[in-house]
């Protein structure tokens, strides 16, 4: 499922500038179609997790690493 950028901004309560910054850093990858930008549900859930970690004081790189970590590693089964 894909969401227009406006919907992603509203759901995650972030600014257009923040979304552009995340895109420039490779956190999310919008798809342009018919003059609009769309993001996948994976992008939305991934960015939501990153924002939660950042709200707890983690820098972007660490938040990103934790969100992208495989489930087994998180549960201590490495």
Where are these regions (language model features)?
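Arg/Lys-rich, alpha-helical DNA-contact motif
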Residues: 1-11, 20, 24-36, 41-78
């Amino acid at each position: 499922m894909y969401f227009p950028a406006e919907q992603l901004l509203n759901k995650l309560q972030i600014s257009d500038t923040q979304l552009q910054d995340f895109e420039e850093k490779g956190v999310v990858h919008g798809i342009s179609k018919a003059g609009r930008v769309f993001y996948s549900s994976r992008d939305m859930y991934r960015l939501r997790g990153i924002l939660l970690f950042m709200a707890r004081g983690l820098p972007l790189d660490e938040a990103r690493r934790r969100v992208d970590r495989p489930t087994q590693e998180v549960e201590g089964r490495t």
